[in-house]
Amino acid sequence: MEAYKSEFIQFALSRQVLKFGEFTLKSGRISPYFFNAGLFNTGADLARLGEFYAKAIQASGVEYDVIFGPAYKGLPIATTVSVALFNHFQIDKPVCFNRKEAKDHGEGGQLIGYGLSGKILLVDDVITAGTAIRESMTLIAQNQAELSAVMIALNRQEKGKGELSAIQEVERDYQCQVLSIVNFDDLMTFIEQAPEYQQYLPAMRAYREQYGVK
C-alpha cells in the first residue's frame, strides 16, 4: 500500500472521520466502520485533505481539464484539491461548482467558476447512491463536456441493492473511472498491520464476505 494511503487512514482516524465499531447505516446494514468526511472541518484538515486527493490524482495519471465539485460537499473539496495541486505539484487547473437551484439574477445560471468544458474531473467525498453523479452528468452533457473520472475519498467496495456497487454502476453507465484515495481493501491492509485495530478484523472480514463486491 502506498505511503499516502496509510497516512490518509491515520489522518482520518485521528480526526474521527473514520471509526471502527458497530454502526447502523441508512441502508439498515450494520457496518463495522463509519466514515464521515464532514468532520474534516478546519483549515488544517482541509489543507491536508486536499493534499491527499492531489497525491491520489497524480498517482492515477488521469487526464482532465477542469475540476468540478458538485453541490454541496464537493465545493470545499474541489477548492482544496485545486490549491493542493498547485502548491505541491505546480499544476494549475480551473475549478467549477454548481448550485442546487439556478439563479436568474446576478451572474445567473447553475454554474459558478470557470465553467464546464473539455475533460472533467469530478471530486466528492463518497458515492452512496450515485445521485450527485447522475445530476452532474446532466450538467456536463448540457455543456458539451466529458466526464473523464470521479475522485472520491473512500470506495466502500460494497454491493448496492443488486450485485454491483453504486460505483460500479456509475462506471458502467458513464464509461468513466471512479478513483479513490483509499478503498475497503486498503482499510483491511491497514488493520492487519496495526495491532491496536486487529480486534476489528473478524467483523470487517464478515462484512466484506456478506456485502463486498466480487
From Swiss-Prot:
Pathway: Pyrimidine metabolism; UMP biosynthesis via de novo pathway; UMP from orotate: step 1/2. Keywords: Glycosyltransferase, Magnesium, Pyrimidine biosynthesis, Transferase. Pfam families: Pribosyltran. One of its GO terms (biological process) is 'de novo' pyrimidine nucleobase biosynthetic process. 5-phospho-alpha-D-ribose 1-diphosphate binds at residues 26, 72-73, 99-100, 103, 105, 124-132. One of its GO terms (molecular function) is magnesium ion binding. Orotate binds at residues 34-35, 128, 156. It comes from the Bacteria. Its cofactor is Mg(2+). It is an enzyme of class 2 (transferase). Homodimer. Catalyzes the transfer of a ribosyl phosphate group from 5-phosphoribose 1-diphosphate to orotate, leading to the formation of orotidine monophosphate (OMP). Belongs to the purine/pyrimidine phosphoribosyltransferase family. PyrE subfamily. This is Orotate phosphoribosyltransferase. It comes from Pasteurella multocida (strain Pm70).
